[in-house]
């Protein structure tokens, strides 16, 4: 969970901490609707853990979207009624009832969910608001392995985000 920064700042962080991987062959979907980053982060994670048993609906969604680009995959996800119902059942009532009505909202910091996980021998960052998955390189298989690398990368990104935020003020 990260404090959300406008996309130009977010892109700068990824460029410093890793490399975009436009050829990423794992499961990666863009977030194409508001307030869905937690659900999308979970899907981006589940879609990259082949050993994890899934229910028939999720297995069908992952299979159906194989080979699609991230934008199209995101659109397919938003059209899955069963997934929207599950997402909305976990959303606070205000997020459902006020969304799209144009009513003024209290100014709050925005936060965003991002997934870090090992895929194909490298640590990847899967952020549905970024144009591609971000490859953060290989990791030591011993000890904490990819978790240690993910912690280092996220600490670096938080430090850079704090620096960008303090400059903007």
Set out the residue ranges of the language-model regions.
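Cysteine-dependent deubiquitinase/ubiquitin-like isopeptidase catalytic cores across multiple families
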Residues: 1-169
């Amino acid at each position: 969970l990260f404090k959300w920064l406008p996309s130009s700042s977010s892109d700068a962080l990824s460029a410093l901490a890793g490399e975009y991987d436009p050829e990423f062959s794992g499961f990666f979907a863009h977030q194409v609707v508001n307030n869905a980053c937690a659900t999308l982060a979970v899907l981006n994670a589940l879609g990259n853990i082949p050993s994890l048993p899934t229910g028939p609906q999720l297995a069908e969604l992952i299979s159906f979207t194989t080979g699609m680009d991230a934008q199209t995959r995101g659109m397919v996800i938003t059209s899955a009624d069963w997934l929207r119902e599950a997402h909305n059942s976990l959303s606070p009532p205000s997020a459902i009832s006020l969304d799209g009505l144009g009513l003024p909202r209290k100014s709050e910091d925005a936060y965003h969910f991002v997934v870090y996980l090992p895929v194909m021998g490298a640590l990847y960052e899967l952020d549905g608001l970024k144009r591609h998955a971000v490859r953060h390189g290989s990791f030591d298989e011993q000890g904490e392995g990819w978790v240690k690398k993910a912690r280092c990368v996220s600490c670096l990104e938080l430090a850079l985000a704090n620096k960008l935020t303090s400059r903007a003020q």
